[in-house]
């Protein structure tokens, strides 16, 4: 039940963000940043800034369980990759997502319901973010108000390294997977080398800047 509630509210928050972004002129970055801070504030109030232990076997199974000797998280990751790739590459909705990302005005003139597409993207993002949160809690056996801090930077770095254009309209699931692997190797490598966490943030920021600059050059400097 706790898993379903967590995923439900995550999807609901994503849907709310999508509703605000699609119905107003407020930049998506501002809306999601505000929602993130509201969520963290609610988490602090609810937990009283304390760490909550999660020891229920049915819950932790999704974080630490195995099927045929492989982590259940691996199966879920593969399922998300397949579903997301299918939506983007094999459906009309996927083509509309690329079109809206590339040029919202042109998409509107071509008859695409930009508001519905935007709403879906944010709701689906909320669903995936909440699913990741549930799996993280199941893996660490704890829930804290700071869980997920800086995860947004990991996500930005991964998608940019994977070839997603910051100007929109370009990107792929396979490229993002490669970006995630690269960021994972980079972070694990720095941990193994004993690099201070503060410097790890510096390195990650530099990587993002380089990736964005390369994207800027590839797009013709526009």
Which positions does each model-derived feature cover?
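Hydrophobic core segments of alpha-helical transmembrane domains in multi-pass membrane transport
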Residues: 7-10, 36, 40, 76-87, ...
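Alpha-helical transmembrane segments within multi-pass membrane transporters and channels
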Residues: 1-36, 178-179
């Amino acid at each position: 039940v706790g898993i379903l509630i967590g995923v439900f509210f995550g999807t609901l928050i994503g849907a709310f963000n999508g509703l605000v972004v699609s119905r107003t002129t407020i930049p998506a970055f501002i809306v999601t940043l505000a929602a993130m801070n509201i969520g963290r504030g609610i988490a602090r109030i609810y937990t009283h800034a304390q760490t909550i232990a999660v020891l229920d076997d049915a819950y932790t199974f999704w974080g630490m369980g195995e099927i045929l000797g492989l982590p259940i998280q691996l199966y879920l990751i593969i399922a998300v990759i397949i579903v997301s790739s299918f939506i983007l590459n094999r459906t009309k909705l996927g083509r509309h997502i690329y079109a809206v990302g590339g040029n919202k005005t042109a998409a509107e003139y071509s008859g695409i319901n930009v508001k519905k597409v935007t709403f879906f993207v944010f709701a689906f993002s909320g669903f995936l973010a909440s699913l990741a949160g549930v799996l993280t809690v199941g893996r660490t056996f704890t829930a804290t108000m700071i869980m997920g801090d800086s995860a947004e930077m990991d996500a930005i770095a991964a998608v940019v390294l994977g070839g997603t254009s910051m100007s929109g309209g370009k990107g792929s699931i396979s490229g993002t997977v490669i970006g995630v692997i690269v960021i994972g190797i980079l972070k694990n490598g720095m941990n193994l080398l004993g690099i201070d966490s503060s410097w790890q943030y510096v390195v990650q920021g530099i990587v993002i800047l380089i990736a964005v600059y390369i994207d800027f050059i590839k797009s013709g400097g526009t």
